[in-house]
Amino acid sequence: MKIDLAPHEEFEKEVAGRFGILPNFFRSSQAAPELIQQLWGFANAGYLDNPMPSIFKERLFVWLSRFCPMRYCIVRHIGFLLGGNHGRAAGDSAAVPQSIEEVVRLLRRPSPWQREMEPMYVLLERLTATLEAWPHADSELEDAMFACAAVLFVEPARSERAKDALIHALGARRFEFFSGCLAFIRTAHYWTMLHPEIQTEDDMHVLMRGHEELARLMLDDSEADR
């Protein structure tokens, strides 16, 4: 016999079915639950159903979440990258989980404001053709694209060269999917700033207690106030 659920219960069931867990992000806005359901629609368009590879999207989400003063997003999305009982990368049950070591390397990368950006721009600008595939995790191309993405994300009014380099590497159509993902990540960050009551889930507290270096990189980042 089919059990009828209230609309919001149906919504939470849908979210949990996609991520493998129910993130507290999608349990916020209790006073206007219909609003968070609309935000879920944007999450699907810009992030979950975006045709970029799942691990690439999730690593991009984690990387850009370094620059958000609220720590909820970086912690939760690292959980998604790690998989298992922490959820699924970009809601993809087929995504291969990353290791703690891979995540730590990502978090240790210098930001654009801690490095010389010229080589990053040149690497993308000198490509002789649009990339046929999205970069592999931990590759030089991913590093360059993420560095340019950070400039575009944090300083959009001063990011013309970064944007042009990304368009050159990706082509116009894939750049739009890339920028759509950035737009949702920005929205998610702003939402957590407006809802500081959103708490990190228990699974991530347990993980951080067992991995002190990872916890430090997540919670104590000098780039968080960008």
Where are these regions (language model features)?
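Hydrophobic alpha-helical segments
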Residues: 1-226
